[in-house]
Amino acid sequence: MTAPLPGQEEIADPAIARDEMVSAFEDQNQNLRSNTSYYEAERRPEAIGVTVPVQMQSLLAHVGYPRLYVDSIAERQAVEGFRLGDADEADEELWQWWQANNLDIEAPLGYTDAYVHGRSYITISRPDPQIDLGWDPNVPLIRVEPPTRMYAEIDPRIGRPAKAIRVAYDAEGNEIQAATLYTPNETFGWFRAEGEWVEWFSDPHGLGAVPVVPLPNRTRLSDLYGTSEITPELRSMTDAAARILMLMQATAELMGVPQRLIFGIKPEEIGVDPETGQTLFDAYLARILAFEDAEGKIQQFSAAELANFTNALDQIAKQVAAYTGLPPQYLSTAADNPASAEAIRAAESRLIKKVERKNAIFGGAWEEAMRLAYRLMKGGDVPPDMLRMETVWRDPSTPTYAAKADAATKLYGNGQGVIPRERARKDMGYSIAEREEMRRWDEEEAAMGLGLLGTMVDADPTVPGSPNPTPAPKPQPAIEGGDSA
């Protein structure tokens, strides 16, 4: 008997595979809590120094370097379409699938989870009319799942999932109440009823591949599962900044106001209750102190300087910028003089190159997901053009609108430059629908210039399905000898 191909082995008992995958999911989920605590800027007791008194631990600051870094990458990523083969424009059907699944909202959230935990997942399934009520049966269900709800076992022989599990917790988030097992040829679903697993659904898709595509934040070829962007060096700088801010707050509270020594004065004169001995702080905060006793003396210590703490925080911010590539202005370490536009772009160069690299990795995952969705909905193999699919990403840099317009105008050069008009419009970021409308206007202007508007010139020469231009009504000649009928 012929052995199954790698990654296409049959699952002998789905229930056993489910239990094994749920156990593996819970094991890996334990390692994700530390990532979440850093991203959420939670207080971490282990970040406090060993000599810090218990009373000061409540002053431990929330430092958001990890969130700032992760969000700075994710917010620059936006998919604009999928181009097949040598096509000039993005594929309309694939983009409709993207929009129908709200992936313009869900995908960026998946990128954030991938940077925090090292990976996210894309799941593909056929709509079930009994479950997915109101869903278009010709549109696949494409979802983005975080690693806190899903786990996929990667087969190192093929670099793709061998099986995957997705779980759903109860309202308290303590117990798993539903699970979906993805295998190369079938998808199984269960839910819990009175503590027992009950079969929910099954979908024998027969793809020969698990309909789950990881979104791994890979940094090396050997890194199959992805690595968190919250690296050990970034964690150590975050903890150090939290400790320094805690000490600065304590110093400001204890020694930020000048302390005074007063001799030869009765306690009642400086606002001390004679019965309880409680200081009322009137003299402590007063600007002018006056006492009746001529022998009274007062001396004052200098207030504590906090510059050493702020200098330390500046050095930590510079280390964070060196580790992450964040521009100085993101960390509030820019100079007093405003930077020029060229200086800002130069400062963002590392961040932009990192986003472009992430786009290439995530773009490959989206292309594989769209190919699986095509096979799932239409059957058979994908067309050759889909094997050369390209994910179209928005420009991750931040040029001003005026700068983009100036560059496009110079490159187009009124038809004499190095790029055509349509390329200039693409560089400006106009959508497909906007460019189609512009082409219609171009043709109308050309027809008006030649005096052909309203004649037998083709009403729709290039853009199928676009609205036809309506010519202006011709004036009716007046009827001699009376009013028009």
Swiss-Prot record:
What keywords appear on the UniProt entry? Capsid protein, Viral capsid assembly, Viral genome ejection through host cell envelope, Viral genome packaging, Viral long flexible tail ejection system, Viral penetration into host cytoplasm, Viral release from host cell, Virion, Virus entry into host cell
The record's Gene Ontology cellular component field reads:
viral capsid
Top-rank lineage group of the source organism:
Viruses
Location(s) in or outside the cell = Virion
**Where's it mainly located?**
virion
GO BP annotations of the record are: symbiont genome ejection through host cell envelope, long flexible tail mechanism
Q: Which intervals of the chain are annotated as region Disordered?
A: 456-485
Spans of biased composition, class Pro residues? Answer: 464-476
Q: Which InterPro entries match?
A: Portal_protein_SPP1_Gp6-like
Keyword Disulfide bond applies:
no
The family line of this record is: Belongs to the SPP1-like portal protein family.
Instruction: Please explain the role this protein plays, according to its UniProt record.
Output: Forms the portal vertex of the capsid. This portal plays critical roles in head assembly, genome packaging, neck/tail attachment, and genome ejection. The portal protein multimerizes as a single ring-shaped homododecamer arranged around a central channel. Binds to the terminase subunits to form the packaging machine.
Q: How does it assemble?
A: Homododecamer.
Designated name of the protein: Portal protein
Question: Which source organism does the UniProt entry give?
Answer: Mycobacterium phage D29 (Mycobacteriophage D29)
